Amino acid sequence: MKKIAVLTSGGDAPGLNACIRAVVRAGHYYNCEVIGVRRGFKGLIEKQFISLTPRDVGGIIDKGGTFLLSAREDRFLEYKYRKIAANNIREEKIDGLFVIGGNGSFQGAYLLSKEFGIPIIGIPKTIDNDTYGTEYTIGFDTAVNNAVDAIDKIRDTSESHERVFVIEVMGRKSGFLALAAGISTGADVTLIPEYPFPMHVIVKSIVDALNRGKKFAIVVVAEGVASAKEIADILNEKLKPFDFGGVRYSVLGYIQRGGSPTSYDRIMASRFGVFAVEEFMRGNRDFMVALENGKILSKPLEVSFGRIKKPDLKDFELNNILTI
């Protein structure tokens, strides 16, 4: 009987519990003992291990967050603490460590493999959808829906008071979330770091809309471009000659990371989790699960390191076409 362990690391994302559930149940289906590691890499260092049965993960597929908890653990940057973690894994006789995480989590786990020979299986999750090597990461669809729901509500106020609203969404240095939310809500301007607009072009877009008789507008901005307040302040100054309700801004913040996962995230998390276990049982090691051209497959873990994943230029052009 093989023994596997699963942890969640880094920022939470909707669908983590669905993925944990899939790993645990697939593990038992293939006659593995399954260990849960609480609080991510911190739990590896402090040996926060719990046994997980199929019943332990019942009723969690619809829950946001991660019932195993997560933490950012700076100690893991130091070799001596990685060695402690590796020794704990060996003492527990764990044959494979399943890491549900993003770029940083994969790089940390990769060191366990290279320095100590710990077999690593990476399952990508982040609402930013910026993990290189996979078209999809767990949590993205729910985050987009959360952002769209909030922007739709703000639009009601924007239209009622004839205001321009600048709405900041998450994504770090990536524009996937902002672009998807912008297209889905019919935003007048969508700003992402990968395809930047000069400020005068942004102002012109809003001015053109006001000149066409429009009295309100929605600007969606990825946090990696600038703060919503900075852009709102500039627009307020530039748009003073126009008769409308002024410019306001809103930062959606952590609401995007929470809540019950969408059906799509539950399905993808389940598929990723089961595929990861099946690949492990076939003898594959040190890989990440990926979605490519609609198919789930495995890639070397290091594929995701140091490379930038960009939104499809066609989607960006689509957004621009639809904002006339």
Curated annotation (Swiss-Prot):
Pfam families: PFK (PF00365). GO terms for molecular function: 6-phosphofructokinase activity; AMP binding; ATP binding; fructose-6-phosphate binding; identical protein binding; metal ion binding; monosaccharide binding. GO terms for cellular component: 6-phosphofructokinase complex. ATP binds at residues 11, 72-73, 102-105. Allosterically activated by ADP and other diphosphonucleosides, and allosterically inhibited by phosphoenolpyruvate. The active site is at 128 (proton acceptor). GO terms for biological process: canonical glycolysis; fructose 1,6-bisphosphate metabolic process; fructose 6-phosphate metabolic process. Its cofactor is Mg(2+). Substrate binds at residues 126-128, 163, 170-172, 223, 248, 254-257. ADP binds at residues 21-25, 155, 186-188, 212, 214-216. It is found in: Cytoplasm. Pathway: Carbohydrate degradation; glycolysis; D-glyceraldehyde 3-phosphate and glycerone phosphate from D-glucose: step 3/4. The keyword Transit peptide does not apply. InterPro entries: ATP_PFK, ATP_PFK_prok-type, PFKA_ATP_prok, Phosphofructokinase_dom, PKF_sf. Keywords: Allosteric enzyme, ATP-binding, Cytoplasm, Glycolysis, Kinase, Magnesium, Metal-binding, Nucleotide-binding, Transferase. It is an enzyme of class 2 (transferase). Gene3D superfamilies: 3.40.50.450, Phosphofructokinase domain (3.40.50.460). It catalyses: beta-D-fructose 6-phosphate + ATP = beta-D-fructose 1,6-bisphosphate + ADP + H(+). Mg(2+) binds at residue 103. Homotetramer. Catalyzes the phosphorylation of D-fructose 6-phosphate to fructose 1,6-bisphosphate by ATP, the first committing step of glycolysis. Belongs to the phosphofructokinase type A (PFKA) family. ATP-dependent PFK group I subfamily. Prokaryotic clade 'B1' sub-subfamily. This is ATP-dependent 6-phosphofructokinase. The gene is pfkA.
